[in-house]
């Protein structure tokens, strides 16, 4: 009988956490992974805008685009964002080990990982090095199933690391409160037993900002969309106890 995908991931996490590379840093960055196993949940939008919001508080921030689709890298390519970024796709365990070494060599205050939406190296690397995992989830049943798998991986990593890390912040994403699903999302995601952060709503300003190659704080400062991101940044710092 074929094993369940979540069980497969858990086994991979165990092997990866106790693999050859040990994660040590001279001056540790705070590593925030934005991760879900399903695409279309607003992951890159959250990663880019959160990175820029954190940089606005005079903190050094590095964004690592680990998704082979390169959405974050395309956004960065316009040169209009206040953060540095690198394209470092994660496709296999070797890529995950390379990411661990790369992050350990950085001196930024924050390293944001825009993880790919598939099972494998992304979940393993996040489990090994992240201080906090943000899990964007839309108001759809498919997203809720994918979120359960991510939460299971996070808990497995906590057990193996024996440090309470990574912490988890579930972020309702692309939410439209006019719909029944949008109104019920907060209640639904609480079932995972992890901290639920402020919602990032479905707003055209995010789409327009991407088209302009800007982050929301420059494109539409003090807008409702910008408020979503500032509220998320506050929740992130609270989760990290900053």
Description of each model-found segment:
Residues 176, 186-215:
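Beta-strand-loop-alpha "switch" segments that mediate conformational coupling across diverse proteins
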Residues 26-31, 35-41, 52-124, 210-218:
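P-loop/Walker-type NTP enzyme "switch/lid" segment
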Residues 122-141:
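Inter-motif core of Ras-like GTPase G domains
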Residues 46:
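Hydrophobic positions on the alpha1 helix immediately C-terminal to the Walker A/P-loop
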Residues 147-163, 173:
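Conserved C-terminal guanine-recognition region of P-loop GTPase G domains, centered on the G4
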Residues 207-230:
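Inter-lobe coupling/hinge region of RecA-like P-loop helicase motors
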Residues 1-33:
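Extreme N-terminal, non-catalytic leader segments
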């Amino acid at each position: 009988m074929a094993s369940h995908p979540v069980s497969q991931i858990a086994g991979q996490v165990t092997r990866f956490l106790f693999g050859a590379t040990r994660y040590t840093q001279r001056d540790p960055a705070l590593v925030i992974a934005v991760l879900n196993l399903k695409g279309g949940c607003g992951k890159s939008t959250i990663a880019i805008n959160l990175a820029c919001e954190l940089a606005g508080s005079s903190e050094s921030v590095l964004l690592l685009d680990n998704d082979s689709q390169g959405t974050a890298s395309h956004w960065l390519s316009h040169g209009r964002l206040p953060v540095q970024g690198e394209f470092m796709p994660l496709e296999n365990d070797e890529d995950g080990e390379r990411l661990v070494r790369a992050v350990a060599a950085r001196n930024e205050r924050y390293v944001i990982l825009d993880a790919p939406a598939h099972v494998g190296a992304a979940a393993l690397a996040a489990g090994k090095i992240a201080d906090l995992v943000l899990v964007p989830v839309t108001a759809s049943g498919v997203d809720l199933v994918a979120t359960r798998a991510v939460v299971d991986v996070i808990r497995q990593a906590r057990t193996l690391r024996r440090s309470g890390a990574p912490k988890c912040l579930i972020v309702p994403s692309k939410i439209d409160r006019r719909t029944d699903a949008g109104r019920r999302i907060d209640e639904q995601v609480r079932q995972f037993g992890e901290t639920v952060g402020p919602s990032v709503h479905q707003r055209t300003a995010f789409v327009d900002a991407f088209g302009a190659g800007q982050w929301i704080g420059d494109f539409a400062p003090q807008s409702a969309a910008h408020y979503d991101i500032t509220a998320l940044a506050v929740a992130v710092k609270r989760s990290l106890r900053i």
